Amino acid sequence: MAVQKSRKSRSRRDMRRSHHHMEVAELSIDATTGEKHRRHHMTKDGFYRGRQLFKASQED
């Protein structure tokens, strides 16, 4: 079984974890509706790249 020779310091542990952060999702603005949405995802209204793929559900 693999066992480390000596304990890793807090500094080395934290340096290793420095890349484990969440990235901010890039947002685009839809040309048709002007609504912000995630890149390569459709808007809540059902628009993607200027076309309406799905009709928006009406919740009352």
From Swiss-Prot:
Ranges of Basic residues compositional bias? 1-20
InterPro entries in alphabetical order: Ribosomal_bL32, Ribosomal_bL32_bact, Ribosomal_zn-bd
GO CC list? large ribosomal subunit
Keyword list (alphabetical) reads:
Ribonucleoprotein, Ribosomal protein
Task: Name the Gene Ontology molecular function terms of this record.
Answer: structural constituent of ribosome
Q: Where is this region: Disordered?
A: 1-60
Listed disulfide bonds for this chain?
Answer: none
Tell me the GO BP annotations in alphabetical order: translation
**What does the sequence similarity comment in the record state about its family?**
Belongs to the bacterial ribosomal protein bL32 family.
**Matching PANTHER family, A to Z?**
50S RIBOSOMAL PROTEIN L32 (PTHR35534), LARGE RIBOSOMAL SUBUNIT PROTEIN BL32 (PTHR35534:SF1)
Q: Which NCBIfam families did the record assign?
A: rpmF_bact
What name does this protein carry? Large ribosomal subunit protein bL32
Organism from which the protein derives: Psychrobacter sp. (strain PRwf-1)
Q: What is the lineage of its organism?
A: Bacteria, Pseudomonadati, Pseudomonadota, Gammaproteobacteria, Moraxellales
Gene encoding it? rpmF
